[in-house]
């Protein structure tokens, strides 16, 4: 086997090399590949492994991360060369996943210790730390809203890849938001994280239901990523909500909701995303299932319900170049009161708008009192979108034309026959179709659609004509 293997990062602006240098590099790479292939099953041991450049990381934390390579439960030289290289690569990937290192290079030499075997290795992982303090200001586009924000992030706070962040933002719907978030890996595993979050948010709901909603709360959560690209999130939430700043036109139903409410809940969310592109996928699936149980615990509060919501999307390419794709989406939710009281306006589902049911005004589908939307406890929504390139525009550009059809509805669950609620939604759905232009960026997706409501109920507000949408979670 060779004396040394080394992985090195190079600057992107190096000058072009001549043909002789190219041939030399190709021959070296070919020779190295042949040596690795010939010795892939050779039993090797790791004499020493060390991480350099981690100046602000605790040695005890580094030792836990390196346990993948230094597994003392296995006998010496029980791994082949290929298995050892894969383990080293996996360990380096784990280091990078903590989001505290900028680069990591691997250097492998023959063991220099006099007590080491001929096929033992010395491994050095050279890392470069990211700045410990990061400050950012800018603008964001969320689901049908925009904001300006300032973020502060402190990395490696206690030397164990902890992250402490603070955020302040002001926007069109979320008038003011402040949050503090602390997260730390559990047992030096980047796939399992413990998070603590404290936040305050003032949301403007006047255009929908004649009030503002002030929310303050804390959340403790445990997040784990499994081997099948699934993400599990278990959270304990304690929230104080206030329906406030009612307008003079607020309906009696909204006025009855005015004031304070306290919610303690336990929630579980499973997410699996295999799409090749977040904004304009051409293949893959997206699944999100959320369960929330409110009203139990040391401080039960006045909210008591069981809430379930499912989101799913399937994308398939319709041609070999993947420039034409079909996307099918479905969402369904149910909310059941556990104390025989009406579920608070703060917790009900809302439906309608460019990111859910195109062709209808934002959150204006379902039960109402006068001009105020009251939300509901049961909903279904379906969407089919055909995306294809613009004429004379390169298919690699993030522009697409879109043909779509949406259907769905929002209502309230009836206790004697909850299934009948969904049958009623399916029998009289809100339906729209249309054509539009899609522009995708890494941060958000923008749509400009001409929409045509085909079917609507008496109270639901359809929008014929141009409708603009900006956000992340589109159907």
UniProtKB/Swiss-Prot annotation:
<feature type="domain" description="POTRA">
    <location>
        <begin position="44"/>
        <end position="130"/>
    </location>
</feature>
<dbReference type="GO" id="GO:0001401">
    <property type="term" value="C:SAM complex"/>
</dbReference>
<comment type="function">
    <text>May be required for the assembly pathway of mitochondrial outer membrane proteins.</text>
</comment>
<comment type="similarity">
    <text>Belongs to the SAM50/omp85 family.</text>
</comment>
<dbReference type="InterPro" id="IPR000184">
    <property type="entry name" value="Bac_surfAg_D15"/>
</dbReference>
<dbReference type="GO" id="GO:0005739">
    <property type="term" value="C:mitochondrion"/>
</dbReference>
<keyword id="KW-1134">Transmembrane beta strand</keyword>
<comment type="subunit">
    <text>Associates with the mitochondrial contact site and cristae organizing system (MICOS) complex (also known as MINOS or MitOS complex).</text>
</comment>
<dbReference type="Pfam" id="PF01103">
    <property type="entry name" value="Omp85"/>
</dbReference>
<keyword id="KW-0472">Membrane</keyword>
<dbReference type="GO" id="GO:0045040">
    <property type="term" value="P:protein insertion into mitochondrial outer membrane"/>
</dbReference>
<protein>
    <recommendedName>
        <fullName>SAM50-like protein SPAC17C9.06</fullName>
    </recommendedName>
</protein>
<keyword id="KW-0496">Mitochondrion</keyword>
<dbReference type="InterPro" id="IPR034746">
    <property type="entry name" value="POTRA"/>
</dbReference>
<dbReference type="InterPro" id="IPR039910">
    <property type="entry name" value="D15-like"/>
</dbReference>
<keyword id="KW-0812">Transmembrane</keyword>
<keyword id="KW-1000">Mitochondrion outer membrane</keyword>
